Amino acid sequence: MRERLGVTGIGVVAPNGTTTEEYWAATLAGRSGIGPITRFDPASYPARLAGEVRGFTARELLPSRITTQTDHWTHMGLVAADRALADAGVRPADLPEYEMTVVTASSSGGTEFGQKEMTGLWGKGPDHVGAYQSIAWFYAASTGQISIRNGMRGPCAAIATEQAGGLDAVGQARRMLRSGARLALVGGTDASLCPYGLVAQLSNGGLSTLADASRAYVPFDEKACGYVPGEGGAMFTVERIDGGREPGGPIYGYIAGYAATFDPPPERERPPTLTRAITLALEDAGLRPDEIDVVFADAMGLPHADRAEAEALNAIFGPHKVPVTAPKTMTGRLYAGGAALDVATALLSMRDGVIPPTVGTTDPVRSLGLDLVLGRPRERTLRTALVVARGFGGFNAALVLTK
């Protein structure tokens, strides 16, 4: 008998909503959080739009001792984790400390904290670099801070597979739950909207340079020209439903199937492996392609990448056979936070029986053969969902959720 791993709590911090229900209401209404960068003056950079999380003040939500030591990305992870636990009705003190685990994903670490410290180093010298730089930048900082804050002393991990990380973190948490953990606090956030971070992102050539926020990120569109970066993400509580604790509320859904693959180097001239990742995830879930009710796409917004994803989906489902959506068009690409947020969105979609829209995309490439949910939500009974993610460098991941 397969284990039942249920998602019992969700916490979201996103550009179009700083709580789960704010985000969900904005997403169903098609309200975008993408706009001009305000965190610094972007005038000298070719990309000047981002999905910033506005109205989020860490010092109002976390102790000053923590905010002083940690980066903005960790602040969002801590708050999302707090909200996921509260949503699940979990009091960590009531559970054995070695049976709780934390897994987070990050693709950039604490770049904003590092920006401040490098500015001090460049302008004033090494005596003006704080000691906390040594821990605030590190990819595992969020995992460490969340586990300390909640007294979770079981096996923990940090995943760095770019946007695929949000799904890979769930896969790693599943392994830990299968190995005896009772509860996992899992997800991903990222925040790299500072000069240092933006320069690093520009290096991959994928960022849109359009100034029109409504047209800058339009995946699967005839005028697709890249993606807009963003910040934020989501955290979840995942529990073994037979683990001895009665869930404090409804179960959003179950982790039914997961798989990850890695693309061969371009010079090998072998095809990418996203199709295989999806196939393996479906097999892991014990589901046929025609049993998937909706796909949450990676939707990179680069024409060649969009076509590769469409070809993978069509190879499995056939053209126009399953609704496909990309709500991240309202937040920007959140890197490790993006796939985690897609998982949250998929779970909320199954809860409410509605598929949120892809916004901005108005002239879809017909030859891609996708049944895109455009413009407005689509009501539909949803029992299953597939979330797809790709990370720069060849990472692919697929996650199947069931109700």
What are these regions (language model features)?
Residues M1-I66, A88, D242-I255, A344-V359, ...:
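ACP-dependent fatty acid/polyketide chain-elongation machinery
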Residues M1-V7, P92-E97, L287-E291, L368-K403:
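Flexible, low-complexity linker/loop segments at domain and module junctions
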Residues R4-T8, R31-P36, D212-A285, D293-V294:
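Condensing-enzyme catalytic core mediating Claisen C-C bond formation in acyl metabolism
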Residues V7, E22-W24, L28-T161, T189-L198, ...:
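Conserved beta-ketoacyl condensing-enzyme motif
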Residues E21-A26, T111-P126, M176-R178, L198-A211, ...:
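A glycine- and small-aliphatic-rich helix-loop capping segment at beta-alpha/alpha-beta transitions
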Residues G77-V90, Y139-S142, S147-N150, C156-T189, ...:
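Active-site-proximal alpha-helical scaffold in enzymes
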Residues G123-G130, G171-R175, A191-E246, V322, ...:
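Glycine-/small-residue-rich "gating" segment that lines the acyl/pantetheine channel
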Residues A181-C225, Y258-P271, A297-R307, K321-D371:
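Acyl-CoA/ACP chain-elongation machinery
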